[in-house]
Amino acid sequence: MQDIIGKIEDYSSKNGILLPDPVVEYVARIADEEKLKEPELQEMVRLFSRIAERNQGLDDDELLDAVEDDYQRILKVQELVKRKRARFPPKLIEDIAEVMKKHELSDDELDELIRRVRRAYDRARVEAGEAVGTVAAQSVGEPGTQMTMRTFHYAGVAELNVTLGLPRLIEIVDARKKISTPTMSIYFEGDLRYDEEFVRRKANKIGKSTLNDVLKNFSIQYADMSVVAELDEEKIQEKHLEYDEILAKVEKTFKKVEIDNNILRFEPPKPTIRELRLLADKVRKLQISGVKNIGKVVIRKEDDEWVIHTEGSNLGAVLKEEGVDKVRTTTNDIHEIETVLGIEAARNAIIHEAKRTMEEQGLTVDIRHIMLVADMMTADGSVKSIGRHGISGEKASVLARASFEETGKHLLRASIRGEVDHLTGIIENIIIGQPIPLGTGSVSVVMKERK
């Protein structure tokens, strides 16, 4: 029993949700009674992690009661679904159990709900042989022809420029490492999201501030070849900056500087007009606070909570800031999401960004088509573009690669390497005039050779 408890604790920590001891013991009893094997135990822990997540905020005893009730409801739904000979994914069964709990459904009402869900689920399933890739390509590509080519301001934030429309969709499917307008939406936890003063302090800490932002006076003294800057204490307090930190930054950056209270006097490395002007420019632009790669920040009130929108992006650094909601805070830089949160998060970001880009143009595309594109882009564990430098350029078939772009180069390389094309795909069979193996889930008839 102790061995099972150890495994359950290990699996739950991997899922990111540590189950309380009473729940762990309850799961261990079920696993012991049903003699669950390793994969089944892992699936059971995932199920209870999801149930525990839905019942957050309860103490251990209340949580155990809630988890037991939810589990019994799921078992009841599973039994009814099995009796109707329906095959639902686990998530759908959990959703039905959740509706049953929320609306306190009777047995007859639950029976009717399962019947309706089954009808809708069967209608939504793809028939074997449907060319889902072709349909997805048409469904995403056709609305793309109606999208605008211009870059608009982000809705509601006139100060920030964000790429929208077709240019943004091209950025997403090309998996560009350097996007034209990276931006972040930073949310806050608990009651901090309603605290305007706290959010403004965070905005000043995250956003870029230069020495020029906190100066009262600035002048170039040509007579004695120096640059004189006077700090403004009011501006420093407004931006919630530390006076000593600013001076430390100045002393670290400039070797020839004299500090007398609020007056800073800088001297150029060489006593020339050109060096003096370069020094003046460098003094003004000296960054005294802010997160790397983030420029301007804008604070907005959205549904009673304060949200920070940024120009530029640094997800890793922002998530380390105190009070930042690590679940909702996001960036439109997909490669940054992949680096910080992993490939599954990057896949979700591709889906969300592509869907939002189309919806902003008033275009509706079924999310499953976009999901298929995202699946193809992230299938091998890294974000790849849809083009000759990504998916299309890495196809196993020589003819398929040659048919897309750079035909001569692909054919020449393949002939040097002595590659063989086994003609298993669609494009290569069209090229040589053979029947094409079209359709997801379609089968081939194979004859067994006589020995």
Curated annotation (Swiss-Prot):
Annotated GO CC locations: cytoplasm; DNA-directed RNA polymerase complex
HAMAP family in the cross-refs: RNApol_arch_Rpo1C
Chain intervals for the UniProt region annotation (DNA-directed RNA polymerase subunit Rpo1C): 69-451
Protein's cellular compartments: Cytoplasm
UniProt entry tagged with the keyword Transferase: yes
Molecular function terms from GO: DNA binding; DNA-directed RNA polymerase activity
Family: Belongs to the RNA polymerase beta' chain family.
Chief location bin: cytoplasm
Entry keywords, A to Z: Cytoplasm, DNA-binding, DNA-directed RNA polymerase, Nucleotidyltransferase, Transcription, Transferase
Subunit structure: Part of the RNA polymerase complex.
Region (Unknown): 1-68
InterPro entries: DNA-dir_RpoC_beta_prime, RNA_pol_Rpb1_5, RPO1C
Catalytic activity line of the entry: RNA(n) + a ribonucleoside 5'-triphosphate = RNA(n+1) + diphosphate
Organism in which the protein naturally occurs: Methanothermobacter thermautotrophicus (strain ATCC 29096 / DSM 1053 / JCM 10044 / NBRC 100330 / Delta H)
Family matches, as NCBIfam families: RNA_pol_rpoA2
Record EC number: 2.7.7.6
Protein name per Swiss-Prot or TrEMBL: DNA-directed RNA polymerase subunit Rpo1C
GO biological process, one term: DNA-templated transcription
Superkingdom field: Archaea
Entry function: DNA-dependent RNA polymerase (RNAP) catalyzes the transcription of DNA into RNA using the four ribonucleoside triphosphates as substrates. Forms part of the jaw domain.
